Amino acid sequence: MTSKLINFITIEKERFEDECVKFIKNVITDSINSRNIATIGLSGGSTPKPIYEMLGNDSSIDWTKVYFFAVDERYIDKSSKDSIYDLISKSVFKNRENLLVDHFITPNTSLPLKECIETYSNDLKKLIEKSNGSPDLVTLGMGEDGHIASIFPNSPKSPLDETDLVYHTTTERFAIFDRITTNINFLASSKNKVFFMSGSSKKKVWDEMESSQINVSRWPAHKIISSGNTNVFYRE
């Protein structure tokens, strides 16, 4: 797979969070200036946590015009420390709890699974309609097995064949079996995509993915990269 489709940036540890926040903030500013709204999809993980915390401390952003949504979520109580809701509510929204309900669109995992998915899909569609049909940015990571969001490699059905905006996935590799994810085509439609990555083990997996023939079932990131406007911020 060609690397020309990726803007790969290696950043020293001391500047990593600053540069990542600067990138997100630029997308937010440009989106608000052009359409008076910014829509940002967020993934979980240990690498983006300090990025989100730093972003949440930025008082120069007009937060009333920024809407976030969960790229995926674990089907667990939202108060669990393992939920993306918990991560985002305690970082991006730590200083603006009054905006949390209306400005962070996330699955209501207290509902039965089918209803949870349907409700989240409808809420997400309404949000994206405000953003000309696609998000302004999605933040992503890639696991050492090659998964992105909760789209896991070599699933029985190719991610390219998933037509539902939001759907249920499962994994036996990680502790929480049931997941809810947005689909790969929706993520690829985002005006900007950014992967946050740290550590040599993740870089090794990334290099393997990038050097492989295009196979979205094995490497869901191939679909993201081939859609263009993909950035990778890597901390050694």
UniProtKB/Swiss-Prot annotation:
Keywords: Hydrolase. Its EC number is 3.1.1.31. It catalyses: 6-phospho-D-glucono-1,5-lactone + H2O = 6-phospho-D-gluconate + H(+). Coiled coil: none annotated. Gene3D superfamilies: 3.40.50.1360. GO terms for cellular component: cytosol. One of its GO terms (molecular function) is 6-phosphogluconolactonase activity. Pathway: Carbohydrate degradation; pentose phosphate pathway; D-ribulose 5-phosphate from D-glucose 6-phosphate (oxidative stage): step 2/3. InterPro entries: 6-phosphogluconolactonase_DevB, Glc/Gal-6P_isomerase, NagB/RpiA_transferase-like, PGLS. GO terms for biological process: carbohydrate metabolic process; pentose-phosphate shunt, oxidative branch. Hydrolysis of 6-phosphogluconolactone to 6-phosphogluconate. PANTHER family: 6-PHOSPHOGLUCONOLACTONASE (PTHR11054:SF0). Belongs to the glucosamine/galactosamine-6-phosphate isomerase family. 6-phosphogluconolactonase subfamily. This is Probable 6-phosphogluconolactonase. It comes from Dictyostelium discoideum (Social amoeba).
